[in-house]
Amino acid sequence: MAKDYYAILGVDRNASQDDIKKAFRELAKKYHPDANPGNKEAEEKFKEIAEAYEVLSDPQKRKQYDETGTTDFNAGSGFNWQDFTHFDDINDIFNQFFGGNFGDTFFGGYTNQPDLDIYLRVNISLEDAYYGASKNVKYRRNAMCEHCSGTGAENKVLITCPTCHGSGQERITRGQGFFRMVTVTECRTCHGRGKIPQKPCTVCHGTGTVSKNEDISVNIPKGADTNLKLRLKNMGNSYGGVTGDLYIVLIVNNPPGIRRSGQDIYVEHTIDFPEAALGGEEEIKLFRESYNLKIPAGTQPGEILKIKGAGMPRINGHGSGDLNVIIKIEVPKHLTSRQKELLEEFRNEKKKSWFHF
């Protein structure tokens, strides 16, 4: 007994092609095996729906079915997935049903999205970071061709790619039935753009870009630290009329004897032991700056004395960190007779005194 394909799709015999396609898409959403994992009944129903659509969506097959009530499927060995010619419709259903580009992802899709941004690592000194600076940076990039405005076309006229018909992708199908694996690759003709130049640009030869050497000045903000990224818009590579950005990634190099922690700076400073005991005042230099630091009496080795607000400027412009001075005490290796005499006197006096340092 011949199958009633119209009843299977739920349409009348005078249904238009749009009505038939709409009915198929709705039923395919409902019964597709990937939406009903492990459901054999849904799997058979989906196969039946696909068979009905294969016949009714083809004018010649539909005419034969309407006139005789039979098709090659009825007379032969039955419907086979190798006979199905509408896998694009099923892929469209995946995209609508699951959202976005699910079909491409599910079937092993690939979309060419070139990374147009350029990242350059630039070394600067801690002094440059302290005061701010301007650095010259040289690099090479693929810039937009000004002759064709990045279109790749001599007359800026683009036509639909004849290979991918504007999709920018080519599909390679492997396997059978709804277990087919569809691999989506970049179109080899238009390189994913979907369009090609009507006549290639005489300057860039159809690529839309030209290689360009850049020599730019980059402003280093006060307080910059390692791994800070400075973004320069539209100074990256170009592709398809779109230009990426240039990111300058800073590496701040500390000079010997100076350490940075956040916005605080640590330096070592050596004093003699009489000053450590009696106290005094020392001049502390940092780059082009000079500070007077009071040394309290009884200062110990390794003690940290703080100069408020003399550290790295905060990059947001609100204040600065601190300059932390790590005290080292120098013990002389060679003494004069008088110095030895005074120290012996000091030691003896200390033994007699109740006060101990």
From Swiss-Prot:
User: What's a Pfam family this protein contains?
Assistant: DnaJ
Chief subcellular site? Answer: cytoplasm
Record's keyword annotation contains Chaperone = yes
SUPFAM superfamilies in the cross-refs: Chaperone J-domain (SSF46565), DnaJ/Hsp40 cysteine-rich domain (SSF57938), HSP40/DnaJ peptide-binding domain (SSF49493)
Where does this protein hold Zn(2+) 1? 145, 148, 201, 204
Q: Does the keyword Metal-binding apply?
A: yes
Q: Which GO terms describe its cellular component?
A: cytoplasm
Q: Name one GO molecular function term.
A: heat shock protein binding
Q: Give UniProt keywords alphabetically.
A: Chaperone, Cytoplasm, DNA replication, Metal-binding, Repeat, Stress response, Zinc, Zinc-finger
Matching entries from Gene3D superfamilies are given as: DnaJ domain (1.10.287.110), Heat shock protein DnaJ, cysteine-rich domain (2.10.230.10), Urease metallochaperone UreE, N-terminal domain (2.60.260.20)
UniProt cofactor note? Binds 2 Zn(2+) ions per monomer.
Residues covered by the J domain:
4-69
Q: Which cofactor does it need?
A: Zn(2+)
PANTHER family, alphabetically? CHAPERONE PROTEIN DNAJ, DNAJ HOMOLOG 1, MITOCHONDRIAL-RELATED
The entry's function note states: Participates actively in the response to hyperosmotic and heat shock by preventing the aggregation of stress-denatured proteins and by disaggregating proteins, also in an autonomous, DnaK-independent fashion. Unfolded proteins bind initially to DnaJ; upon interaction with the DnaJ-bound protein, DnaK hydrolyzes its bound ATP, resulting in the formation of a stable complex. GrpE releases ADP from DnaK; ATP binding to DnaK triggers the release of the substrate protein, thus completing the reaction cycle.
Q: How does it assemble?
A: Homodimer.
Entry protein name = Chaperone protein DnaJ
Gene name for this UniProt entry:
dnaJ
